[in-house]
Each structure stands twice: as C-alpha cells, then as structure tokens.
C-alpha cells in the first residue's frame, strides 16, 4: 500500500529571527540542518520512489539532507506550487513588531485565518488553490500507481495539503501547526483511501549524528 510522508523544512534563518518569510529565499540555520538530519535518520526504514519540494532553498536543502541520511537516490520534482504562502508586504518584518503596529488580533488574523489576505500576499485559501490542484494532478497519480512519495515543503503549503487529506475545516485549521523537521506519515489503501495518519517520532534526546552515518 502506498505511503506519503510530508516534512516541513528545518528551522530557517528567518524562523530564528521571528520574521515573516513567505517566498523570501533564506537558508537553514545549523539547528535546521540538524532537524533535517534527524528526519532523515527516522525515515531510514521507509522506501521512497519519488520526492517533491518547492523552489525555495530551505526546502530543497532539507530534502537533500534527508535523502543523504536515508541513502536514497530518487527523482526530485521542484515546483513553486509547493512554495510557502506568500506574505507579501509582511515578508522580512518581525512578527512581534507587526503585532505592536497593527494589533494582536490583526496579527493573528494574518497568520492563522483561512481567508485573511496580508497586503500584497496570499491567504491560506489562496495557498490551497495552488497546492491542492498540484497534488491532485502530479502527486496523487504517483500514489495511485503504488509509489511511495516524500514531500518536503513549508508550514502553510503543507497545512493546505493537510486540509485536503485530513478533511480539516477552515475553522479548525487555525489551530493546526506543523513543527519544523517533523515527518508526518499518511498510509493509504490500494484505492487511495486514507487508512492512518501519524507523526514519525523524532528522537526524544539529542543524537550524535556522526555515530549514525
């Protein structure tokens, strides 16, 4: 039976600084690289046939580290449909400072609402409108053919996909988050009915990755 694993990229430089990132193309921090290494370690027991990611380097780098850890050599498809939600004019701004300027309620609406559009950017609804068709047209056929798929992308593009796969409502998605570097496993039937959803647990204690290479 086919499986799908989704992974949010490791911590980025702007995650660390609490900045709105969106389509800004920033790199991973050393912590983010370690998160990707841990994800790769726990994914070693799983076989993947193909991987999908965005065109942003924090996701591409995370995927590269994961595949290096698993030892897999598989096709990789990069597409901007899997990019992070575009935060428009908020990109590069500190979230706390935005809250001070516009108020906490507006900050929460821009970050968590399904329909709220930041100036010059996308709502989560807009993000769904590109992520879900791409999944249906390009990724779902791979699963239907029995292939195991790995997707490494971003918090909001993956939340959009979670809404579709797990039938999460626009109201409930506001309370759903996805930690950096935490693999989420979807197991399907041969007819692509969803059988189970679970996180593949990362190590409870820090690992010396060098001993596992």
UniProtKB/Swiss-Prot annotation:
Annotated active site residues, numbered on this chain, are: 9, 84
Q: Which UniProt keywords apply?
A: Gluconeogenesis, Glycolysis, Isomerase
Gene3D superfamilies from the UniProt entry: Phosphoglycerate mutase-like (3.40.50.1240)
Q: Which GO terms describe its biological process?
A: gluconeogenesis; glycolytic process
Swiss-Prot/TrEMBL catalytic activity: (2R)-2-phosphoglycerate = (2R)-3-phosphoglycerate
SMART domains for the chain: PGAM (SM00855)
* CDD domains xref list: HP_PGM_like
Where are the residues marked Transition state stabilizer as a site? 154
GO MF term list? phosphoglycerate mutase activity
Which EC main class describes this enzyme? Answer: isomerase
Q: Which domain of life is it from?
A: Bacteria
Coiled-coil segments on the chain, per record: none
Enzyme Commission numbers on file = 5.4.2.11
Which residues make up the binding site for substrate?
8-15, 21-22, 58, 84-87, 95, 111-112, 155-156
What pathway is it annotated to? Carbohydrate degradation; glycolysis; pyruvate from D-glyceraldehyde 3-phosphate: step 3/5
Its family?
A: Belongs to the phosphoglycerate mutase family. BPG-dependent PGAM subfamily.
Q: Per its database record, what is this protein's job? A: Catalyzes the interconversion of 2-phosphoglycerate and 3-phosphoglycerate.
Name of the featured protein: 2,3-bisphosphoglycerate-dependent phosphoglycerate mutase
Organism equals: Cytophaga hutchinsonii (strain ATCC 33406 / DSM 1761 / CIP 103989 / NBRC 15051 / NCIMB 9469 / D465)
**Gene name, Swiss-Prot/TrEMBL:** gpmA
């Amino acid at each position: 039976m086919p499986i799908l694993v989704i992974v949010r990229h490791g911590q980025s430089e702007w995650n660390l600084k609490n900045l709105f990132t969106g389509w800004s193309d920033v790199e991973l921090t050393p912590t983010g690289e370690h998160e990707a290494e841990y994800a790769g370690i726990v994914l070693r027991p799983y076989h993947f046939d193909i991987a999908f990611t965005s065109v942003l380097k924090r996701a591409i780098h995370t995927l590269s580290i994961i595949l290096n850890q698993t030892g897999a050599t598989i096709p990789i498809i990069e597409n901007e449909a899997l990019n992070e939600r575009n935060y428009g004019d908020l990109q590069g701004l500190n979230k706390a400072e935005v809250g001070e300027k516009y108020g906490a309620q507006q900050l929460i609406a821009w970050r968590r609402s399904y329909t709220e559009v930041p100036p010059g950017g996308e709502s989560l609804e807009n993000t769904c409108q590109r992520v879900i068709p791409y999944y249906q047209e390009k990724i779902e056929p791979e699963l239907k053919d029995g292939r195991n798929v790995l997707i490494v992308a971003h918090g909001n593009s993956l939340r959009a996909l979670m809404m579709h796969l797990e039938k999460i409502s626009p109201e409930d998605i506001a309370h759903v988050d996805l930690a950096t570097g935490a693999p989420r496993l979807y197991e399907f039937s041969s007819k692509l009915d969803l059988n189970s959803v679970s996180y593949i647990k990362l190590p409870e204690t820090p690992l010396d990755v060098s001993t596992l290479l």
